[in-house]
Amino acid sequence: MYLDAGTNNETYVRDPLYVGLRQHRPPTEELYAFVDEFVDAVQEVFPNCCIHFEDWTGSDAIALLARYRNKVSCYNDDIQGTGGVTLAGLINGLKITGGQLREQRVLFLGAGSAAIGLANLIVSAMGQEGLAPDVARQQIRMFDTKGVCGEFRFRRELGSEISRYNAVAKYTTQV
């Protein structure tokens, strides 16, 4: 089953090969009400199915997964699948190098839903190795098109420039 709520990308709307719904997506509140109705209907007809939220925008992907994860069987491969496979690679790489995940500092090049999902899994895995979540989060940084996200970005926007090279050198993973 495929749920299409439209697109706000004008290039897609004008593209004759675009197969999606050629209208703007509704505002968030209206969109989520529509998804609520869809999820309720699917659960009524197929109560044991798993709903896969595929290719939603980053903030919507995270919000929808959080909204339904304790209500229905649901999954987002960008957030959960990519994160699970990548975390497995990190853990197995550390078996070769002899390190522990809790000792690593990780820099993400990108701060989308896949990166956020993986970062959350890394925090959880570091927790299983005895590291407190707030300490684990301090070992993770995200770098997007505007630079390093979080504390460093605020400093930069206030005028205290931090070079991207130094950010990468300080927070690069050692795996």
Label the model's feature ranges.
Residues 76-175:
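Glycine-rich phosphate/diphosphate-binding loop of Rossmann-like nucleotide-binding domains
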Residues 1-104:
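Glycine/serine-rich phosphate-binding loop and adjoining beta1-alpha1 elements at the start
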